[in-house]
Amino acid sequence: MGKVNVAKLRYMSRDDFRVLTAVEMGMKNHEIVPCSLIASIASLKHGGCNKILRELVKHKLIAWERTKTVQGYRLTNAGYDYLALKTLSSRQVVESVGNQMGVGKESDIYIVANEAGQQLALKLHRLGRTSFRNLKNKRDYHKHRHNVSWLYLSRLSAMKEFAYMKALYERKFPVPKPIDYNRHAVIMELINGYPLCQIHHVEDPASVYDEAMELIVKLGNHGLIHGDFNEFNLMLDKDDHITMIDFPQMVSTSHPNAEWYFDRDVKCIREFFMKRFSYESELYPTFSDIRKEDSLDVEVSASGYTKEMQADDELLHPVGPDDKITETEEDSDFTFSDEEMLEKAKVWRSELEKEADPADESGGSWCCSSTDSKQIKDGGLPEESAHVSSFEVTALSQAVEEMERQVLPHRSVTEFSEESRRTENDGQPGQRSPAGSEDCDDEPPHLIALSSVNREFRPFRDEESMSSVTRHRTRTLSVTSAGSALSCSTIPPELVKQKVKRQLTRQQKAAARRRLQKGEANVFTKQRRENMQNIKSSLEAASFWGD
């Protein structure tokens, strides 16, 4: 894990990066990627995958490993750096790479420049350089995976840091401006300052101390705790202002150990100022001083904020007083209307039984009295009475529907079919059954009334609607099928030729790919040759001793 040597980057071809990317893709589910898989993923046009692999091994971009069961290649940190730099250069973010500025336990910092000559900072994450025995317990990069690669963890760390940096920069926190990221590389603004650990004299230690403590509290108010807030992750410019760096290990204030992390950050700053600048203050923040203003931990998914906590937060939001009033009003209106409907239906049914004529009862139809109809026609009925009458008619129809639901389940299918046939016979003129017939006595009067009403509302269709053609049928009619009787095919012959040619080309490419994969997978041939050589040498030794 030395310095990045980008001198060979300009001489690498497209096929070299294709094979390097194939090794990276194979490492998603392989610790050691076999040669056959690399050849099939790369799918080089002219072959030669083994030759490129040997060149990449020579330049230490990949490494050859062989165990008792498998043998193949794995990606190194240098190869991962080349892939990230190639992508950033294609995006026109990085044009040149300069000197190394700093080395940390988890990252390397380099000076880079874009096409305009503006200097930026390149941070390459190097998780796994030092021993992290409890990494799975301290960081949540791996989620629920048991076996993870250090390259993959470095990529997750860079992605998380870029997300934090972007969110904090948009909220006016003193952090570098994020530019771009790819894989384990993060491009950010180059800060003109020095780390706080390298500074031995400050004009006003109290102001710097207050600014650091205010920054800790401000992070807590936004739902975040730095987790590693010390002199190594703070930079001081010429005006003695603090800039915060290196925060992929941030945790949420909802974390079970949030108070411990908060107190540790405060303790680190207090001890540093007391040792370096001989400054000690009795004023320092505590975890209870946090007043949450924003949920930045939810936005960037900080450690400790789970989906269960998010669901609990949604349940904890109380319903406003307006919502409660609306719900109670809706429930009360619905209950009152239902009771009133039933009462009105009972009253109206009793009145109909008293005032209805025998002929109307036998015929199964009901109507209003002559005086009421006359008043309605003349318009002499007041508005309130008209409204009440319309409401009562609606209530009666609803009551009739309720009675239908009670009667129909107890009737058999044959009875229902016989009733439908009798209803059809009743609908024909001159064939109406007498009032005292058995059919009418067996059937409830309201069912006969509904059947007569339904016959009055049958759909009406004129001649134009009967002769119209469905629209989607007209769209499928082609000119050749409608106007030509000589040809039965509706597909142009040119299109048929193109499809056949495309299919043949696809088959040829598939066959070439299979031959390429078979030719590249020469590891087994090498093993057979070694075994034959061992057998031959053992036989020669046996014949030499005369056995």
Swiss-Prot record:
It is found in: Cytoplasm. Autophosphorylated (in vitro). Phosphorylation affects the timing of the metaphase-anaphase transition. GO terms for biological process: maturation of SSU-rRNA; positive regulation of ribosomal small subunit export from nucleus; positive regulation of rRNA processing; protein autophosphorylation; regulation of mitotic metaphase/anaphase transition. Its cofactor is Mg(2+). GO terms for cellular component: cytoplasm; preribosome, small subunit precursor. Residues 97-273 form the Protein kinase domain. GO terms for molecular function: ATP binding; metal ion binding; protein serine kinase activity; protein serine/threonine kinase activity. Keywords: ATP-binding, Cytoplasm, Kinase, Magnesium, Metal-binding, Nucleotide-binding, Phosphoprotein, Ribosome biogenesis, Serine/threonine-protein kinase, Transferase. It comes from the Eukaryota. CDD domains: RIO2_C. InterPro entries: Kinase-like_dom_sf (IPR011009), Rio2 (IPR030484), RIO2_wHTH_N (IPR015285), RIO_dom (IPR018934), RIO_kinase (IPR000687), RIO_kinase_CS (IPR018935), WH-like_DNA-bd_sf (IPR036388), WH_DNA-bd_sf (IPR036390). It catalyses: L-seryl-[protein] + ATP = O-phospho-L-seryl-[protein] + ADP + H(+); L-threonyl-[protein] + ATP = O-phospho-L-threonyl-[protein] + ADP + H(+). SUPFAM superfamilies: Protein kinase-like (PK-like), Winged helix' DNA-binding domain. Pfam families: RIO1 (PF01163), Rio2_N (PF09202). PANTHER family: SER/THR-PROTEIN KINASE RIO2, SERINE_THREONINE-PROTEIN KINASE RIO2. Associated with late 40S pre-ribosomal particles. Interacts with PLK1 (via its N-terminus). This is Serine/threonine-protein kinase RIO2. It comes from Mus musculus (Mouse). The gene is Riok2.
